[in-house]
């Protein structure tokens, strides 16, 4: 399929918000990723999409430290409402540092550091994700043009650099609470996320 990912299998995935088709992909090193699709995404028209990085704490454990779970839920609802779209779910926990390192970083955040300071203090990258994986999935599914649900300009640029036409960026401002207010501000101030529209 591509040098980054290989397609493995697809299945029907009924959810609280509707039925998706789940497509499984695997990196050469064994890391697995999925894409959830609704409708025909390969007809050449711009496809509503979200590139979502795995967040066990937010997506599955409902942590209020981040906005990941609410973003995933909002994206799934939006794709179902549109009747056509794709959610690329990349297994890049903790902005790519892994779950255990994320727990270590959370410990430092509990002591007063922000999300960027904690990663740096641990000698870890601030963001180690590789959004080119999404481009490989789009390529396999025949997607060349997207409407991207994101606040992260790096996702937009990576797709543009890969030849994907990003016709629209749709802000995804959900899940703010007292626990994650500083985290969201840090994403805006230090990571360039577009949090004010």
UniProtKB/Swiss-Prot annotation:
Co-factor binding details: Binds 1 zinc ion per subunit.
InterPro entries: GTP_cyclohydro_II, RibA, RibA-like_sf
Enzyme Commission number(s) from the entry: 3.5.4.25
Residue numbers binding Zn(2+): 55, 66, 68
Amino-acid positions noted as binding GTP in the UniProt annotation, renumbered to this chain: 50-54, 71, 93-95, 115, 150, 155
Active-site residue numbers: 127, 129
Segments forming a coiled coil: none
Pathway where it operates: Cofactor biosynthesis; riboflavin biosynthesis; 5-amino-6-(D-ribitylamino)uracil from GTP: step 1/4
Cofactor(s) this protein requires: Zn(2+)
Reactions the enzyme catalyzes: GTP + 4 H2O = 2,5-diamino-6-hydroxy-4-(5-phosphoribosylamino)-pyrimidine + formate + 2 phosphate + 3 H(+)
GO biological-process terms attached to the record: riboflavin biosynthetic process
GO molecular function terms noted in the UniProt entry: GTP binding; GTP cyclohydrolase II activity; zinc ion binding
Pfam families, A to Z: GTP_cyclohydro2
Highest rank taxon of the organism: Bacteria
Function: Catalyzes the conversion of GTP to 2,5-diamino-6-ribosylamino-4(3H)-pyrimidinone 5'-phosphate (DARP), formate and pyrophosphate.
Entry's family note: Belongs to the GTP cyclohydrolase II family.
NCBIfam families hit by this protein: PRK00393.1, ribA
Protein name, entry field: GTP cyclohydrolase-2
Species of provenance: Neisseria meningitidis serogroup A / serotype 4A (strain DSM 15465 / Z2491)
Encoding gene per record: ribA
């Amino acid at each position: 399929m591509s040098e980054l990912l290989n397609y493995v299998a697809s299945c029907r995935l009924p959810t609280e918000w509707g039925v998706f088709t789940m497509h499984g992909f695997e990196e050469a090193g064994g890391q697995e990723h999925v894409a959830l699709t609704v409708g025909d995404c390969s007809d050449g028209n711009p496809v509503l999409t979200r590139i979502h990085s795995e967040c066990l704490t937010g997506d599955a454990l409902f942590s209020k430290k981040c906005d990941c779970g609410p973003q995933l839920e909002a994206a799934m609802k939006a794709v179902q409402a549109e009747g056509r779209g794709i959610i690329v779910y990349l297994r890049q926990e903790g902005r790519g540092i892994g779950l255990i390192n994320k727990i270590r970083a959370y410990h430092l955040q509990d002591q007063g550091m922000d999300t960027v300071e904690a990663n740096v203090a641990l000698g870890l990258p601030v963001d180690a994700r590789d959004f080119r994986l999404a481009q490989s999935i789009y390529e396999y599914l025949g997607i060349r043009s997207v409407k991207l649900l994101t606040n992260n300009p790096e996702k937009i640029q990576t797709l543009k650099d890969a030849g994907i036409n990003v016709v629209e960026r749709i802000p995804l401002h959900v899940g703010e609470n007292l626990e994650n207010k500083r985290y969201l501000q840090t994403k805006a101030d230090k990571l360039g996320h577009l949090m004010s529209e």
